[in-house]
Each structure stands twice: as C-alpha cells, then as structure tokens.
Amino acid sequence: MSDEEHHFESKADAGASKTYPQQAGTIRKNGYIVIKGRPCKVVEVSTSKTGKHGHAKCHFVAIDIFNAKKLEDIVPSSHNCDVPHVNRTDYQLIDISEDGFVSLLTENGNTKDDLRLPTDDTLLNQVKGGFEEGKDLVLSVMSAMGEEQICAVKDIGTKT
C-alpha cells in the first residue's frame, strides 16, 4: 500500500453531538431546550396532570438564544427532549474590520476572525463605541449547535 491511500479529510468537528437527551419532566426554567431545531432558553414551564388518555405533558415557552424569537412546545413529561450543549467563552477584542467582522484573541494566543458584529443595536454601540475610545474590551461569545454569536461585552480598562 502506498502512503496516498492513508490520507483522509480532517474535519473541524470531532463528531461530538451538538445536543444531549434529557427527560422533559426534569427540564426547568432557565434551562436550555431544542425547539424546532433551534437552541432556546426556557422562560416558562407548566405541567398538565395525567389525563384519561395518556401522559402528563410539559408545556415549554422558550426564547431562541440567537435570534430572541419566542418558541413553544408541548412534550409528554416522560419523553426525552434534545438539550443543546451551550458554551460561553470570553475573548479579547483586537480589531473591527470594515466588513463587520471582529478579530478576537483566544486564550492560546491565536486570533478568531469568523464572527460578525452583534445585530443587537445596544450591544453593537457598546462594542463599536468602546473600541473607538481605545478601551480594552472582552466579548462573551455564546455557542450552541454550530452557531456562535457575541452576547455580551465587558470593559477591562483602557489600552496602555
């Protein structure tokens, strides 16, 4: 066999699941749930009693963590729901490009250049304003199910 037969395409994704199962009856307010394929934060849970024909049901009201849309779902409490793996990571802001992308410094010293400026006006103004004033900013990035978005900004002082 030649060396060429052993080459394979490496993927950025290690094959880990983007969600994990959790019984509907154990999901609480402020937890996370996948509704209609979107990662959401639960804002309200109500449980109906077991009826004559079936299981107790959980009624979830949740907000999409990326686009803030309200979604609802009703699931039997004994069934499993998908729960997204949600990570929040802080990065230091290095630069803002003219095309609306940010350049961020990761913990290991590399740069991350694939994130757009936030669409939320308040957050956008905080990031742009602070950067123009020469402040050292740390941006919190929320990631779930293959999506990433800037969700918060912290001022850690002025640049020296």
Swiss-Prot record:
Region annotation Disordered: where it falls in the sequence: 1-21
Name under which the protein is recorded: Eukaryotic translation initiation factor 5A-4
PTMs per UniProt: Lys-52 undergoes hypusination, a unique post-translational modification that consists in the addition of a butylamino group from spermidine to lysine side chain, leading to the formation of the unusual amino acid hypusine. eIF-5As are the only known proteins to undergo this modification, which is essential for their function.
Record Gene3D superfamilies: 2.30.30.30, Nucleic acid-binding proteins
SMART domains: eIF-5a
GO biological process, one term: positive regulation of translational termination
Molecular-function GO terms, alphabetical: ribosome binding; RNA binding; translation elongation factor activity; translation initiation factor activity
Residue numbers carrying Hypusine: K52
Function (record text): Translation factor that promotes translation elongation and termination, particularly upon ribosome stalling at specific amino acid sequence contexts. Binds between the exit (E) and peptidyl (P) site of the ribosome and promotes rescue of stalled ribosome: specifically required for efficient translation of polyproline-containing peptides as well as other motifs that stall the ribosome. Acts as a ribosome quality control (RQC) cofactor by joining the RQC complex to facilitate peptidyl transfer during CAT tailing step.
Short name of one Pfam family: IF5A-like_N
Family to which this protein belongs: Belongs to the eIF-5A family.
PROSITE patterns: IF5A_HYPUSINE
Keywords per UniProt: Hypusine, Initiation factor, Protein biosynthesis
Sequence ranges of Basic and acidic residues compositional bias: 1-12
Family matches, as CDD domains: S1_eIF5A (cd04468)
Superkingdom of the source species: Eukaryota
